[in-house]
């Protein structure tokens, strides 16, 4: 599979160069330098968080663990990769890359970051630089650092993925599916949340710092906390449900997958079982709506109508129709987040609200839906998450009792269901030119079944 993906890289890099050509011409620059970044330190400490490469750098070169590296690009020329391999006996220096993709670059190895200055110099040309630059780079003569117009153009067009990027995301999805299967097995064997997390990391072969985001491993009521990352150490806790939101990465591209499991159908409240079945059905319906030209906001609003229908049908919501529950805010008590987001190099990929590539105008969220991360129309190559949720969150339920929405809620049913926490199902779905969406997540689970 790696060889097949390598064959897609040259066309991907040509696409990245073409984006840079247009962005540089529009913004009045002669060339581009992209800096990979440098690890920082914790306050008053000589240790710091794990290094995370600049996503713009990863768009050019799949080097996740390569600090103080640069890509320099002048339109019409081969891109230059300046690779920093320090002379260091405290830490193992990164190996000079030799993979097939490096043939597309002029590769130069340096021992000190300062040595890059002369290599990046382009005479009187106006160079824009993208990255978080250390103070000592301030005098290197870049015409601009992180210019807004340039970033806006590149961010907007990064939404549509190349065949290479889609191939990487399929691999990330496959890794994630393997991890999810291992995690469910550990849960059913009685492991703690922390031990389930360890089983996941072991199965995907990634250190915690290499995951695209912190794993959400929640038993029971913990599933009602949207970003529950506590990872409890005890095994002897209530565990009627298991919600896992965990992804993987391949060459810098992420997967973002959520599943909800029950411990034992026979011992589970029938109403919760009904809601589980309804959420599975409606999630697939929402995935099917990922088609070219479709307004993602409409998928979000459809999710509210469908979830409202499940709440009314199950008896959790009473005294109003599903349509009314979606309009009056009752559905938001149980589904308080957006239906999803763009996915790619970054888990919450950029420019989700952008009206165009100028960066000056945003497409507004629907009124009352402030947490929606994507408002654009879909186009071929775009990958989005579809993640409807239904939760029993104390804070929001308390607010409903205070603001009048509580009159539509069957509190006896809610109290019965609160120990289960909630339900979320999340797939990564690619919009295709043919119209039929490609569900990266479901395809991956089918391969590991």
PLM regions: where:
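Active-site neighborhoods and metal-handling regions in enzymes and metal-associated proteins
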Residues: 1-449
């Amino acid at each position: 599979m790696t060889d097949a993906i390598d064959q897609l890289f040259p066309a991907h890099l040509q696409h990245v160069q073409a984006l840079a050509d247009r962005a540089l011409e529009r913004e009045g620059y002669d060339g581009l330098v992209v800096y990979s970044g440098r690890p920082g330190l914790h306050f008053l400490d000589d240790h710091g968080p794990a290094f995370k490469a600049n996503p713009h750098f990863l768009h050019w070169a799949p080097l996740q663990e390569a600090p103080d590296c640069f890509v320099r690009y002048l339109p019409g020329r081969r891109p230059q990769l300046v690779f920093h391999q320090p002379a260091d006996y405290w830490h193992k220096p990164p190996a000079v890359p030799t993979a097939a993709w490096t043939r597309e670059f002029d590769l130069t190895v340096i021992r000190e970051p300062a040595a890059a200055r002369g290599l990046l110099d382009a005479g009187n040309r106006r160079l824009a630089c993208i990255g978080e630059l250390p103070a000592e780079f301030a005098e290197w003569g870049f015409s601009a650092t992180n210019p807004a117009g340039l970033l806006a153009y590149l961010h907007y067009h990064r939404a549509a993925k190349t065949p290479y990027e889609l191939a990487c995301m399929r691999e990330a999805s496959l890794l994630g599916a393997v991890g999810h299967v291992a995690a469910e097995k550990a849960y059913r064997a009685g492991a703690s949340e922390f031990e389930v997390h360890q089983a996941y990391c072991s199965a995907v072969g990634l250190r915690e710092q290499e995951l695209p985001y912190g794993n959400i491993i929640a038993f029971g009521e913990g599933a009602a906390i949207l970003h529950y990352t506590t990872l409890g150490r005890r095994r002897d806790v209530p565990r009627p449900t298991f919600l896992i939101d965990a992804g993987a990465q391949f060459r810098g591209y992420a997967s973002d997958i959520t599943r909800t499991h029950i411990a034992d159908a026979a011992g589970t409240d029938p109403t919760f079982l009904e809601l589980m079945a309804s959420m599975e059905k409606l999630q697939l319906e929402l995935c099917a709506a990922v088609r070219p030209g479709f307004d993602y906001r409409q998928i979000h609003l459809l999710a509210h109508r469908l979830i409202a229908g499940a709440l009314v049908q199950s008896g959790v919501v009473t005294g109003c129709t599903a349509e009314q529950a979606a309009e009056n805010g009752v559905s938001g008590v149980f589904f308080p987040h957006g239906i999803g987001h763009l996915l790619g190099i970054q888990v919450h990929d950029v420019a989700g609200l952008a009206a165009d590539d100028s960066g000056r105008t945003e497409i507004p969220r629907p009124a009352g839906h402030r947490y929606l991360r994507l408002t654009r129309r879909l186009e071929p190559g775009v990958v989005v998450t579809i993640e409807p949720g239904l939760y029993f969150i104390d804070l929001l339920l308390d607010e409903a009792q205070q603001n009048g929405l509580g009159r539509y809620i069957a509190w006896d049913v809610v109290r019965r269901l609160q120990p289960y926490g909630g339900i979320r199902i999340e797939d990564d779905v690619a919009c295709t030119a043919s119209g039929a969406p490609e569900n990266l997540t479901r395809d991956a689970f089918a391969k590991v079944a």
